[in-house]
């Protein structure tokens, strides 16, 4: 169904969410209709933030907000749903629009499989009534479901529309770009060159896919890399855990701006721990590129200042490959925690592949390699 008609059925004037490729039609519609507007549309750091922000909107207006998200974000909403929204607490009504990755019976990437299996069960456990929208679902069926949901919403309960792949359509094309000339895949190529045989923990999305293909192109082993294919926002904490246990080995984390924002508190712990053998690189294109390109707030904030305030003893931002190479060499030689922000353009190769090894194989090979490290 057309996303414009879906929005009319929802009849909401405030949306907040974390972008999802399954919801690209809705995301593009919201950007085309509202852009980023605190009164009507906010892209928040994580799904729990969205839920709290939407709760504040309801408290101020008495109206019902919409929170959109990928099903991988269900874990982030459990706490505010259970201890803030629930009708045994504050009874705050909300409409969740959830992209269903990893739906049973439909091929998807490994990080989505289990989440897809438990998506509906988690909603049931949270007491959230849901309606699944597929390609063949009619507007009349969605409208009837929304009308039925009004009873729950009027009682301060929460409801959800679970969106299958291709269920929503939007004809208007929205392009996302910035003026940064550097290309993420080339940035990662430079990191691989500088890091040598040091272990790398890479963030979810296209960065890990590009790292995998660079190793393939170079004829190098994948044992050096832990590809954090899911678990968005946690790669730096994984890298910290490795670095603390392997103090004689330089550990590199290749992170993204959307991931850093999602769980930014990890930077405070990382800076306070200050492992001398870790390099934290954030490739900042100011966008959730892997799921469509919608903007993050990272273009508006000073990540270097944040890193410094969190206790990183060395923090820099680079905008050219020459600057990047210089800082990578310095980080390699330095016995101190280093933070490098790399300003990056939006975009990737059309033929970018996916890892051909399984997640378990990746883990086993990485762990075997770490046994050789000090």
Which role fits each region the language model picked out?
Residues 1-124, 128, 132-238, 244-245, ...:
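Thiamine diphosphate
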Residues 69-72, 249-260, 265-267:
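DG-centered beta-turn motif at the end of beta-strands
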Residues 81-82, 91-94, 264-284:
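A short alpha/beta connector and helix-capping loop motif
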Residues 150, 320-333:
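A short, acidic, amphipathic alpha-helical segment used as a generic capping/interface helix at domain edges
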